[in-house]
A protein has these predicted regions:
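Flexible phosphate-sensing "switch/lid" loops adjacent to ATP/NTP-binding sites
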Residues: 1-348
Length: 348
């Protein structure tokens, strides 16, 4: 509702002659992934029904407002973030913001309750916050700061998930969410399975449940790369192996030995089949790792670096890459960001 209200206010401001924009960067959203609506033309009903505009719909979870709500430390921080939200470009190339549009108050009214974390419970009665979750491939892929801080305040232990693999999810969790809110994780759990490792080892998806020591060994470098990346951030790492009923004991032992050789803790998780009881070994290893203590986060890059330098640091330190090549569209976007001169290049 807030996302589409903002889109309507932008179109209304243009229709009323309040602003002349050369580009509108804000799109509408809906909950159905309808590819026919990704790129459309609106305002075809004549002067009384708006200005013809090339636009489109994104899926709701991809809305920038979701990322803003999840990163906001409180209502005042939310207002500041909404004020500086860029929704379009004026004819002179400068940014047209939500504050300039005068839409912040209306959005605050809609998002005020959305800032409150949703408290639920597992089937075993364990309390949990389910709140937020912007996509990690286009945003930061973490739950809300409000939910994390609430969990840390009321519980002895707070566990949060960073979406996607550790190269994407953990990196953004550390470099964006933790850095912007002064959070210091005590340990990091890296989840894997024999099936996943065999798939990385080249086995076709229908065959990953079968015993295949060669494929497992071929997939282990992927796990070791993730471990090395997490250790570079200064984290105590616990590898949690999701257990399946037909897992081979010898293959599990190979993974265990590789983890111990890499200097990290290892435990088998049977939580899917046995609930909390099946995850006790993981919990014990996490508690032991926390006692040893992680170092203060060693971020992948400095905020003083240029955008290109930050991308290169993530590429080499996290993904193990060498050089970065940019598409023409990416280069145009970088040029726009720098031309706005709003300090974006100094953000995580």
């Amino acid at each position: 509702a807030a996302n589409n209200l903002l889109a309507a206010l932008i179109d209304n401001a243009r229709h009323q002659g309040q602003v002349d924009l050369k580009e509108i960067t804000w799109r509408r959203v809906l909950d159905v992934n309808d590819r026919m609506l990704r790129n459309i033309v609106t305002g075809l009903g004549g002067p009384a029904n708006g200005i013809p505009t090339e636009t489109g719909f994104d899926i709701t979870a991809a809305s920038e407002l979701r990322a803003i709500v999840c990163l906001a430390a409180g209502e005042e921080d939310l207002r500041v973030r909404l004020d500086r939200l860029v929704v379009g470009l004026k004819r002179d190339g400068s940014a047209y913001t939500c504050k300039e549009l005068g839409a912040t108050g209306a959005l605050m009214a809609l998002l005020k309750d959305a800032m409150l974390p949703n408290l639920v419970q597992s089937i075993e009665g364990v309390p949990a916050f389910v709140h937020g979750g912007p996509f990690a491939n286009i945003a930061h892929g973490c739950n809300s700061v409000a939910a994390t801080r609430a969990a840390m305040t009321i519980a002895d232990w707070a566990i949060t998930e960073a979406g996607f693999g550790s190269d994407l999810g953990a990196e953004k969790f550390y470099d964006i969410k933790c850095r912007m809110n002064n959070l210091q994780p005590a340990a990091t759990i890296l989840v894997t399975s024999l099936r996943a490792l065999k798939w990385h080892g080249g086995v076709p998806l229908p065959e990953i449940g079968k015993e295949n020591m060669d494929a497992l060994i071929n997939g282990l470098p992927n796990l070791k790369a993730h471990i090395a990346s997490l250790k570079c951030f200064g984290q105590q790492v616990v590898v949690s192996l999701n257990h399946f009923a037909n897992d081979n004991a010898e293959e599990i032992d190979v993974v265990r030995k590789e983890c111990l050789a890499a200097g990290v803790r290892f435990a088998i998780s049977d939580g899917f089949a046995k609930g909390g009881e099946g995850a006790l070994d993981v919990a014990r290893e996490v508690m032991a790792a926390v006692k040893e203590g992680s170092k203060p986060l060693n971020y992948a890059y400095s905020l003083d670096e240029s955008i290109e330098e930050k991308i290169q640091d993530v590429n080499t330190k996290v993904y193990g890459g060498q050089d970065v090549s940019y598409s023409s569209a990416a280069l145009k976007d970088l040029a726009k960001i720098k031309a706005l001169n709003m300090g974006f290049e100094k953000l995580p």
